[in-house]
Amino acid sequence: MGKIIGIDLGTTNSCVAIMDGTQARVLENAEGDRTTPSIIAYTQDGETLVGQPAKRQAVTNPQNTLFAIKRLIGRRFQDEEVQRDVSIMPYKIIGADNGDAWLDVKGQKMAPPQISAEVLKKMKKTAEDYLGEPVTEAVITVPAYFNDAQRQATKDAGRIAGLEVKRIINEPTAAALAYGLDKEVGNRTIAVYDLGGGTFDISIIEIDEVDGEKTFEVLATNGDTHLGGEDFDTRLINYLVDEFKKDQGIDLRNDPLAMQRLKEAAEKAKIELSSAQQTDVNLPYITADATGPKHMNIKVTRAKLESLVEDLVNRSIEPLKVALQDAGLSVSDINDVILVGGQTRMPMVQKKVAEFFGKEPRKDVNPDEAVAIGAAVQGGVLTGDVKDVLLLDVTPLSLGIETMGGVMTPLITKNTTIPTKHSQVFSTAEDNQSAVTIHVLQGERKRASDNKSLGQFNLDGINPAPRGMPQIEVTFDIDADGILHVSAKDKNSGKEQKITIKASSGLNEEEIQKMVRDAEANAESDRKFEELVQTRNQGDHLLHSTRKQVEEAGDKLPADDKTAIESALSALETALKGEDKAAIEAKMQELAQVSQKLMEIAQQQHAQQQAGSADASANNAKDDDVVDAEFEEVKDKK
């Protein structure tokens, strides 16, 4: 069985890890970095760039450089959060035919899972380069507060990237695994505060140790899937734009190129202000008007940044209270607080969390790598490489159905340990009713329409009977990935209907298969291109070396042979300009055949040179001992 890799598919950065013996190892990508920016760019000449190369060209290609796609995955276009992003993102977010949030890239409609798959492909390639073997299986992490549609869409992204997603696990749980495995302690209750690039989660996790086996049980989870570092960046960008407008009278929001430069500068300034009290945002030639070029030079203090984002940090505190309440615990019951996600490096975030829990958060967990390490550990658990670890996760939101009067009736309440199964018997609302519609919902609101609709199906063929008489058993079954399967059965007739909640904001099987085929086709064309380049290089080398040999052979090469070689060289040169690998190889073969005589001459010349240099060395040895000693010394240095 091959390795199951662990992938942290982040909003801003992604990371991949594997189990190396008993230790999890974070892998470096082709650029030598342990994390990869979750940025995908589609260039004008049809190339797809992922990670640092995509980030580098963002300034000159803002409309086709896609970032923070995780904020859109599994979401509807009309969602309030998506509409907020529509107005601030430089790329184009559109509504798909099925109501999902998709993207328009160079006139082509693309689904978020399709784009996220490009990042996953890079993670897969990073692992394959390290292991030297194909990788087909992965554990991928998602925010604990992701709903069913978002989880399913993440699984779809894995499939499109050519990965069988063996398990979807929650990011805070993964971080707890990374933290808890190397701590030889007894029972502990920990709080994982995870503020990443686009999402926020809090999980309360109990680590129990019984006879050497560690059980990681999630007691409660809460969060906000649209709160993260990107929002902090946006606040700073808006401040800089407003200051520049006050100073110069120019609104940079109408200039995508300037906004892209500003985004990079704001992110850099935010990071610098975690260690410095003040920084300069200095962007020469940011724009120009009739009077000439304009430059931005604005001082930003840490206090200013904190005043801009204070409400965002406070927004993360409310879910902490709810999670503790759901777990039935108080602040004093928490032994350790772990910070995950790059945004937790901000001193103000650390201070607020410390104030809430009454203790300093731990600093020995790398906030960028902990989640990927935990995912790799879970991969090790699934392959049997990691023993004595049991992970008990929970469903983040209540699941139920719509019942008479538009009420949401929960079958599985939030923070129930998964996998789980629950059944309840319902009946008809009308006399002689022959069919019922099962409307599956996710959320905490009483009114059905205020919750997230996950899908609906009909159960037909109910025998005529007075209302309230038929017995319809509805069963909710959640698997270990947190994905829901629902069935309804008429106990009288035995008729049954089932549905797996395929992300209602997601892709159908046909669309996924097409994207998988496209990805495979791209991989094939990439491989062919690589082979073509290698053959071209070989042809180029042959061309150069043959010309040199013709020159050196001079008059020793018969005229007929020379003409044939010149003709073959010209044919190879033409073939090298084309895209046909077979044609290049054929012309190389032809050149080799007509160059037989040339090769003989080259070998003779080489043999003569060798003999000549041997004679010269012998003469030198006779003539002058001192020179010989110097010669020997130089040879030793070599």
Swiss-Prot record:
<keyword id="KW-0067">ATP-binding</keyword>
<dbReference type="InterPro" id="IPR018181">
    <property type="entry name" value="Heat_shock_70_CS"/>
</dbReference>
<keyword id="KW-0597">Phosphoprotein</keyword>
<dbReference type="InterPro" id="IPR043129">
    <property type="entry name" value="ATPase_NBD"/>
</dbReference>
<keyword id="KW-0235">DNA replication</keyword>
<dbReference type="InterPro" id="IPR029048">
    <property type="entry name" value="HSP70_C_sf"/>
</dbReference>
<dbReference type="Pfam" id="PF00012">
    <property type="entry name" value="HSP70"/>
</dbReference>
<dbReference type="GO" id="GO:0005524">
    <property type="term" value="F:ATP binding"/>
</dbReference>
<keyword id="KW-0346">Stress response</keyword>
<feature type="compositionally biased region" description="Low complexity">
    <location>
        <begin position="603"/>
        <end position="620"/>
    </location>
</feature>
<dbReference type="GO" id="GO:0051082">
    <property type="term" value="F:unfolded protein binding"/>
</dbReference>
<dbReference type="InterPro" id="IPR013126">
    <property type="entry name" value="Hsp_70_fam"/>
</dbReference>
<dbReference type="InterPro" id="IPR012725">
    <property type="entry name" value="Chaperone_DnaK"/>
</dbReference>
<comment type="function">
    <text>Acts as a chaperone.</text>
</comment>
<dbReference type="InterPro" id="IPR029047">
    <property type="entry name" value="HSP70_peptide-bd_sf"/>
</dbReference>
<keyword id="KW-0143">Chaperone</keyword>
<dbReference type="GO" id="GO:0140662">
    <property type="term" value="F:ATP-dependent protein folding chaperone"/>
</dbReference>
<feature type="region of interest" description="Disordered">
    <location>
        <begin position="603"/>
        <end position="638"/>
    </location>
</feature>
<protein>
    <recommendedName>
        <fullName>Chaperone protein DnaK</fullName>
    </recommendedName>
</protein>
<feature type="modified residue" description="Phosphothreonine; by autocatalysis">
    <location>
        <position position="199"/>
    </location>
</feature>
<keyword id="KW-0547">Nucleotide-binding</keyword>
<dbReference type="GO" id="GO:0006260">
    <property type="term" value="P:DNA replication"/>
</dbReference>
<comment type="similarity">
    <text>Belongs to the heat shock protein 70 family.</text>
</comment>
